[in-house]
């Protein structure tokens, strides 16, 4: 994943420099909220079936991107994301409840295309944008707040190697700052087993940009 992202950045930077494209470098941080398309299931704990429910909690992301083009632009990037979810397992016999907050750490290579409502060659201090694209994520690790050997905790190996999402939203560029609001729609299953749940997420970013 790291080699792919570095190669992609090198190719895009060489293209932008060679052909005189308007481009900028961006760094950002922000928040996200995850929601699975199928947030209910079952788990086996101590030989007893438990009803499992998963709900999203606020998470965070940090990244960098290179934007090149004029009114129409392309934006490859690299991102580190922290996703938090609460897992509730309810014993189907005793109705006892086990709660666990899982923190999922991922790296991803988002690729977006967009349209600026104002020509940046005329006005580069303020602009409004709409964008769409794809994001490929890989789960690096999973941490649990209430880990127990008695529970079948979800680990990094339980996730598919590449989780693909569609990405679309809007943004504002204001001087050297910018803000993005977006939504990711899961396209591939999150888990390696038979569960076909996909991950959707709302996110917002605020960052700095350097234009060239």
State each model region's role.
Residues 1-28, 210-212:
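Bacterial Sec-dependent N-terminal signal peptides
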Residues 19-23, 71, 118-127:
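Short loop/turn motifs that connect adjacent beta-strands in outer-membrane beta-barrel proteins
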Residues 19-63:
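Short glycine/proline- and aromatic-enriched beta-strand/turn motifs that initiate or cap beta-hairpins
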Residues 21-23, 56-62, 103-109, 126, ...:
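Residues that define the transmembrane beta-barrel architecture of outer-membrane proteins
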Residues 27-31, 60-70, 78-80, 109-115, ...:
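Residues on the lipid-exposed face of transmembrane beta-strands in outer-membrane beta-barrel proteins
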Residues 35-54, 82-105, 138-160, 189-199:
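Flexible, solvent-exposed loop segments that connect beta-strands
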Residues 77-87, 156-212:
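Predominantly the C-terminal beta-signal and adjacent terminal strand-loop region
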Residues 100-112, 116-119, 127-142:
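Structural signature of Gram-negative outer-membrane beta-barrels, strongest in the C-terminal barrel
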């Amino acid at each position: 994943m790291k080699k792919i992202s570095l190669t992609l950045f090198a190719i895009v930077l060489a293209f932008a420099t060679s052909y005189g494209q308007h481009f900028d470098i961006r760094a950002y941080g922000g928040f996200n909220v995850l929601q699975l398309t199928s947030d209910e299931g079952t788990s086996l704990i101590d030989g007893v079936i438990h009803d499992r429910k998963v709900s999203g909690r606020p998470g965070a992301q940090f990244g960098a991107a290179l934007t090149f083009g004029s009114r129409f632009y392309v934006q490859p990037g690299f991102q580190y994301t922290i996703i938090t979810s609460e897992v509730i397992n309810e014993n189907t016999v005793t109705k006892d409840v086990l709660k666990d907050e899982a923190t999922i750490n991922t790296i991803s290579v988002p690729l977006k295309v967009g349209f600026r409502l104002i020509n940046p060659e005329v006005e580069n201090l303020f602009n409004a944008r709409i964008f769409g694209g794809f994001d490929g994520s890989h789960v690096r690790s999973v941490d649990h707040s209430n880990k127990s050997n008695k529970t079948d905790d979800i680990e990094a190996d339980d996730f598919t190697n590449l989780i693909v999402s569609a990405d679309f939203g809007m943004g504002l560029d204001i001087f050297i700052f910018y803000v993005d609001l977006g939504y990711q729609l899961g396209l591939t299953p999150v888990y390696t087993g038979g569960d076909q749940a996909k991950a959707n997420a709302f996110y917002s970013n605020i960052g700095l940009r350097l234009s060239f």
